[in-house]
């Protein structure tokens, strides 16, 4: 089998295509959630906390000197990214929960004979 043909079969396998679609949709979903958090949730949260803009929250570690910019710890952006993560994780949890609910439960394998029944059968065979 040629290398190209083998790669084509691999790339067109259902799992790879499904994963590619998931990555693309996940990227788009991430942008939507980032916009939701940055443009809707954080401004409302800022108003509730007295007009704080979380994007501007930072701790200056070293002041700017001449042409060198200040060294800052931007914890406001970190808080915003934590909100992004929580919303995305919760949405994924809900989707997986819904998918698992839709999946049909796997049929149980038929139960075989018990250990006692097998031992009795072996005993009977040895008696013959």
UniProtKB/Swiss-Prot annotation:
Its main location: membrane. The keyword Cell inner membrane applies. GO terms for molecular function: mechanosensitive monoatomic ion channel activity. It is found in: Cell inner membrane. The chain crosses the membrane at residues 10-30, 76-96. Keywords: Cell inner membrane, Cell membrane, Ion channel, Ion transport, Membrane, Transmembrane, Transmembrane helix, Transport. Pfam families: MscL. It is a multi-pass membrane protein. One of its GO terms (cellular component) is plasma membrane. It comes from the Bacteria. The keyword Cell inner membrane applies. InterPro entries: Mechanosensitive_channel_CS, MS_channel, MSC/AndL, MscL_channel. Belongs to the MscL family. Homopentamer. HAMAP family: MscL. Channel that opens in response to stretch forces in the membrane lipid bilayer. May participate in the regulation of osmotic pressure changes within the cell. NCBIfam families: mscL, PRK00567.1-4. This is Large-conductance mechanosensitive channel. It comes from Actinobacillus succinogenes (strain ATCC 55618 / DSM 22257 / CCUG 43843 / 130Z).
């Amino acid at each position: 089998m040629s290398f190209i043909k083998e790669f084509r079969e691999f790339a067109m396998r259902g799992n790879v295509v499904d994963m590619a679609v998931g990555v693309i949709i996940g990227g788009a979903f991430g942008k939507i959630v980032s916009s939701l958090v940055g443009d809707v949730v954080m401004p409302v949260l800022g108003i509730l906390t007295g007009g704080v803009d979380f994007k501007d929250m930072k701790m200056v570690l070293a002041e700017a000197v001449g042409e060198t910019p200040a060294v800052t710890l931007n914890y406001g952006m970190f808080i915003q990214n934590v909100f992004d993560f929580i919303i995305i994780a919760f949405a994924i949890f809900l989707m997986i929960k819904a998918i698992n609910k839709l999946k049909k439960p796997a049929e149980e394998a038929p139960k075989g004979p018990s250990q006692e029944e097998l031992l009795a059968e072996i005993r009977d065979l040895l008696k013959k």
